[in-house]
Amino acid sequence: PGCSSLGVGAFSENGPFRPSGQVLVKNEYSWNKEANVIYLETPAGVGYSYSADAAYYQGVDDKMTAMDNMVFLQRWLQKFPQYKGRDLYIAGESYAGHYIPQLAEAMVEFNKKDRIFNLRGVALGNPVLEFATDFNARAEYFWSHGLISDATYRVFTSACNYSRYVTEYYGGSLSPLCARVMNQVTRETSRFVDKYDVTLDVCLSSVLSQSKILSPHEQVGQRIDVCVEDETVRYLNRRDVQAALHARLVGVDKWAVCSSVLEYELLNLQIPTISVVGSLVKSGIRVLVYSGDQDSVIPLTGSRTLVQNLARDMGLKTTTPYRVWFEGQQ
């Protein structure tokens, strides 16, 4: 939580342009080729977004974020009524495994009183859906990809697993045992592996700032130079760009990928949202859960386990068998 969909989603992943030096270049894989896309910097305090009351930034949580996001969409549709009634899909990645289901749930509930959201589906990429399952999948992922030793894998799954470490860390009660285990894991995985794509050169990563939120131990004393991210930061801090975007900085000196003023209730990580996904399916909302298979932060193995269990509990059947998926010749 606390990182920008403008900086990451729009400029590093699926937006219409990417920064290249002093200019923008077209992204041939832009989602804008298929739909009108809004990239929302949320909650207030992220990126260019701000609150008139700085006290807002203290203790922001999932519930507040869902309500604020829904109010934003309500007011956006009021301002641009030509978009009312159009099919609406909401998408996100990582901690948006909380943001998106919770927002969709609020929209479904609101529609019972006043149907203004034509919500058709949601898409969740490598999402945090259930804290222990998702976070503890990291150990097996590291081990299976040769990033940690057998001995480290054993202590990372028995002495102190990742969900326990994160709980202690954000709860301000980090035990010496978990500190030792994470030091060992960090030493072996190193800061030269992009945790969001373990096969990439770290310089090509676009999302390492987020990993400092979901991998808190690794933020101490480390600053990895990430090329795409750095170009985005430089571009969005240009005065002429800010003027063109009608954006201004309030309460911060510069635009950053992840907020330095927001104090999010990070233990909201422990709130499961997989059941919310199930309720959305029951209400007729289409749900896509997809995973990049080289992401070690929220590995596909955890997501697959959660989705399979949900499908079993709901009595859902497989309609399309598992298959090789080609895009062009790849």
Give the predicted meaning of each segment.
Residues 1-330:
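Terminal and linker regions of secretory-pathway proteins
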